[in-house]
UniProtKB/Swiss-Prot annotation:
Keywords for this protein: ATP-binding, NAD, Nucleotide-binding, Nucleotidyltransferase, Pyridine nucleotide biosynthesis, Transferase
Matches recorded under SUPFAM superfamilies: Nucleotidylyl transferase (SSF52374)
Family affiliation: Belongs to the NadD family.
GO molecular function, one term: ATP binding
Name used for this protein in its record: Probable nicotinate-nucleotide adenylyltransferase
EC number(s) per entry: 2.7.7.18
Amino acid sequence: MRIGILGGTFDPIHLGHINPALDVKQQLHLDQIWLMPNHIPPHKNTTVVSTHHRLEMVKLVCQQYPEFKLCDIEINRDTPSYSVTTLTLLTQQYPDDEFFFIMGMDSFVQLPLWYQWQSLFNLCHIALCQRPGWAMDTNSEMTKELLFRQATADYLDSPSHAKNGRIFTINSQLVDISSTEIRQQLAQNIDISTVLSQTTTEYIRQHQLYR
């Protein structure tokens, strides 16, 4: 199978996560998208709601969207969520599958700061979501990386194509809102149902989260 991996704190999960993931699936003809909530050490206290609530909201989104599947490999671990460690485990557990790590341009340009970031290309492809008309700095280290590794969806049609190491740029109508902004608006009792899935909106109301 061809599987997209989208990680995040999902505090809460919103259409800014969901829509680009659906675009990736459609444009690269993937079989599934796995939503992977990050592990947050209790002492860091960097999320607003509990791990339980974050996990339940993702489960509900997976029920609403059959294209999605919950991947709990990180959230059940007691160690930091290094992407390269997670993808190493996934490729060992699912050696016949092909993984596409989904990220935005803002994360991609910061990739050299990630733990063993270059090893990612030995484990997966990268599906890079960009807003139409968005351009990288031509002198950036990651611009050179992108030009070297860039491929189109046609590349995947070849039976002998490599299962890792390529970057696919995805044109996506990104929802310009963050989880932080959503939490702030919820705290002010502002209706934000247009940027949340129906199941997430109902869950937040039912459990009175982010108040």
